[in-house]
Amino acid sequence: MPAITLPDGSVRHYDAPVTGTTIAADIGPGLARAALAMKVDGRMMDLSRAIAADAQVVFVTRKDEAALEMIRHDAAHVLAEAVQELFPGTQVTIGPSIENGFYYDFARNEPFTPEDLPAIEAKMREIIARNAPFEREVWDRQDAIRFFQDKGEKYKAQLIQDLPDTETITVYRQGEWLDLCRGPHMRSTGDIGPAFRLMKVAGAYWRGDHRNAMLSRIYGTAWRDQKELDAYLHQLEEAERRDHRRLGKEMDLFHIQEEAVGSIFWHKKGWRLYRALENYMRRRQIEAGYEEVRTPQLVDRSLWEDSGHWDKYREHMFIATVEDEEKTLALKPMNCPCHVQIFRHGLRSYKELPLRMAEFGACHRYEPSGALHGIMRVRSFTQDDAHIFCMPEQIAKETADFVAMLASVYRDLGFDSFRVKFADRPESRAGKDEDWDRAEHELREACRLAGVEYELNPGEGAFYGPKLEFVLRDAIGRDWQCGTLQVDYVLPERLNAEYVAEDGARRRPVMLHRAILGSFERFIGILIEQYAGRFPLWLAPVPVVVAPIVSDANAYAMEVVTALKRAGVTWAEADLRNEKINAKIREHSLAHVPVILVVGRREAEQRQVALRRLGSQEQQVMALDEAISALATEATPPDLRQ
């Protein structure tokens, strides 16, 4: 009979299978009221499920982070019930919890509109108030298929048909309504609480395939209490204010147009920002012992077949056929196979390892148009990509050195902290299990020796190896996964990379794939939103504008600009237009220019400037030399400051 071990180490013995509800009640009435679900040996389960064997049990209450996913999952079910009550004949498809919320996809003749959301949300609150219990039922597979087919729910029937034969078919009832679901769920609809809101409608293809029917998706957000909901809604407002697409337009940084969907037209100011970041990263990599290379954009399919990308990644590749040569080429989606070709060009010695090879490599990956998002999710992008060819005993030091470099770069760019996730082997992968065992062991050991603490991200490794994912948190609390480090024994084997070891034998190098920014385009989008367009001088596309009050000061304004440029403030500008000074200040403030130097006759005569910072109404009168020295220091990239 089951022995139930609780988090405090105490053990409760039962003479028969026991439910979580009973255990919680035995512990005390407070827990019986607060418990929403339970973890049984680490697996989330309904409180109503019976435990028949010895197990470790942890109860989940509203205070626990794990409750959020339960609240959102249950809210998705209530959303589906509300829609079917209000819009009979609507078919339900899938409705998962997602980061910060949930959604449900519906099949109906007319898509939902934002105007439908208030009524649906009101109906959801009505269903929650009914406090109907969630009840789990196990059904026969064929009975379940017939049931949903008879209801006209063809998508649910298809989902069941596609499940493995070994999968148990379960449905959950909430009052008179039910849905196909693996669970788990909380006790009742009332446990969801009032802290939710429907956010928007969108279109989505069934199973994400553009060849399938277009469905109507409703997104919502749900939280543990009103305070959390209000904080999230405030974050969304702040995110809208910082949206890189809007700021990019206001600051004249870039644009995107239909003739090149998923690719960026960089304007001169945006390209200045891009180049400032690229030059900074180039210096940091040179300092860390990387050699920069350049590899082709179009590569024959044979290399992608050898590397495994053709099988695992072909649907994301842009492919071209050269008819007169009967060749099939692909725009490279990543740089690693090409870097192996450089490593293989000539006989390598163990004395050359670790060999650190870097490239600001342009890559192309197909993304559905609906998934594209400004410059953050595109089809054509450049990575700060590098590969370290090393021996197994060098992995730990290279990992530690990389993490130290990454942390320093992030600090320079305005991010003081980051989290690390360990992504292990995915279901679809290349290589032998023993190679994966070795790679995962080596990466865990490298993390231990480097003092890197991580959380597990199961099944999210690359198809050729496990990886560390470095997650930034921005100024408004959003997480961005940017940097990566991957350990790869597979690609050197597939592409026949080798070196001569100290004993004269030929050996395979270990390949470490690493990036700090990820893609320049996405990271610049993150930077725009992190700073809300208010860049530090060293990154600002226009760091300083000199604005004369009267035309008599134009010559002095140009002299100031020349002095700034000589001091290293390369993109300083003068605004010599015949406009009132307040209009100039307003215009350049809206363009997020960090510093405006106001000059008039008196400033010209006394060799001074009136310095005005973005967001401030105050002007600081300074000697010209003093101002130039201070601004030149601010405009110097952090890695070049003394």
UniProtKB/Swiss-Prot annotation:
Stretch list, region Catalytic: 243-536
A Pfam family hit: HGTP_anticodon
Localization per Swiss-Prot or TrEMBL: Cytoplasm
PROSITE patterns: AA_TRNA_LIGASE_II, TGS
Listed EC numbers: 6.1.1.3
Catalytic activity: tRNA(Thr) + L-threonine + ATP = L-threonyl-tRNA(Thr) + AMP + diphosphate + H(+)
The protein, known as: Threonine--tRNA ligase
GO biological-process terms attached to the record: threonyl-tRNA aminoacylation
Gene from which this protein is expressed: thrS
UniProt xrefs under Gene3D superfamilies: 3.10.20.30, 3.30.54.20, Anticodon-binding domain, Bira Bifunctional Protein, Domain 2, Threonyl-trna Synthetase, Chain A, domain 2
Function summary: Catalyzes the attachment of threonine to tRNA(Thr) in a two-step reaction: L-threonine is first activated by ATP to form Thr-AMP and then transferred to the acceptor end of tRNA(Thr). Also edits incorrectly charged L-seryl-tRNA(Thr).
Entry keywords, A to Z: Aminoacyl-tRNA synthetase, ATP-binding, Cytoplasm, Ligase, Metal-binding, Nucleotide-binding, Protein biosynthesis, RNA-binding, tRNA-binding, Zinc
Species whose genome carries this gene: Granulibacter bethesdensis (strain ATCC BAA-1260 / CGDNIH1)
Cofactor or coenzyme needed: Zn(2+)
Gene Ontology MF terms in the entry: ATP binding; metal ion binding; threonine-tRNA ligase activity; tRNA binding
